[in-house]
Regions:
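Beta-strand-rich recognition/accessory modules
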Residues: 210-285
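Beta-strand secondary-structure signal
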Residues: 89-93, 131-133, 163, 258-262
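Beta-strand-rich N-terminal accessory domains
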Residues: 1-40, 147, 266-270, 276, ...
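A short, structured loop/turn motif at beta-sheet edges
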Residues: 78-87, 123-126, 201-206, 217-221, ...
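Beta-strand elements of well-folded, non-transmembrane domains
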Residues: 94-98, 111-120, 136-140, 166-170, ...
């Protein structure tokens, strides 16, 4: 358990994260949201359970309420030993366990860290990428609704799924999407192939760009809405390519949801054609 058990849950996360030059690219246990940890895969609304952390948005009160509903994503083993070298892969199985101890879902999660190029832009100023590929299977025996605070009634709060929390120094950073939008409010809830955040660093000279690809969300067993973006920069920098931004996924018994996303961490402030060229080079698929 991480931190206060009333706020946090056990889940897989990647932390610490750094750019190739050493600057931080994430934060762990920030004072405003103790359950934010680097780059993590979680889910805010799983029927009445919360596999995200903190309070749950309540349909009746129309605000956040602390409940005894924090679930746990329990690592049960690696399918293969984690690899090293030029490409690092973590291939693991997890069980989603409710606050009452019920086993609701199985997950097969793969993190693949790749494309390290330490000197792409200058000595020590390079990039690297990480992919998430995951399959979530309903083991409960009845349909499970996978949603978000927006599906529960809060506008512009559809965060769920793979979630990045940037360092405090990135508050107020610039953001742009592949569709040409360049404001957090404009991008929030939209569909786009990618979103990019850029900022100067604290502690290190220069700046960087975090490039996030929406990827894919598919299921042969349920209707799946398009991935939409949850983005913020004003109070802090966050990004989530949300599979259930404003529409629930009703995953039937034994049904499986498949997700695939990518982050690229770039030790250079990119914009315009340079950003588009990198986005094309490292696109998914």
């Amino acid at each position: 358990m991480i931190g206060d058990s009333s706020l946090c849950l056990v889940a897989g996360d990647l932390f610490p994260l750094r750019f190739t030059g050493g600057a931080e690219v994430s934060v762990r246990l920030p004072w405003d949201h103790r359950w934010h940890t680097g780059l993590q895969f979680t889910w805010s609304h799983v029927d009445d359970q919360n596999f995200w952390g903190g309070a749950s948005f309540d349909k009746d009160t129309k605000w956040y309420v602390m409940k005894d509903n924090l679930g746990t994503m329990k690592h049960t083993g690696f399918r293969n030993n984690p690899t090293g070298g030029g490409e690092v892969t973590f291939d693991e199985d997890l069980k989603w366990i409710t606050a009452a101890g019920e086993h609701w879902m199985n997950e097969h999660r793969i993190h693949r860290i790749h494309s390290l190029d330490q000197n792409r832009f200058a000595a020590g100023r390079g990039l690297w990428a990480v992919d998430l590929t995951t399959e979530i299977t309903n083991t409960r025996g009845s349909t499970i609704a996978l949603g978000s605070p927006t599906t529960a009634g809060r506008e512009h709060a559809g965060y769920t799924g793979w979630f990045w929390r940037g360092p405090r120094s990135w508050t107020g950073c610039s953001v742009t999407s592949s569709t040409g939008l360049s404001d957090e409010a404009e991008i929030m809830g939209t569909e786009a192939e990618w979103v990019a955040f850029s900022s100067e660093h604290d502690d290190y000279d220069g700046g960087g760009t975090v490039l996030v690809y929406s990827g894919t969300s598919t299921s042969a067993d349920a209707e799946v809405p398009p991935i939409k973006w949850f983005t913020r920069t004003g109070i802090f920098a966050v990004a989530s390519p949300s599979p259930a931004f404003d529409q629930e996924i009703h995953l039937p018994a034994d049904g499986t949801l498949r997700l695939n996303h990518r982050f690229v961490f770039i030790e250079e402030v990119l914009e315009g054609q340079q950003l588009k060229a990198i986005a094309k080079e490292y696109r998914l698929g």
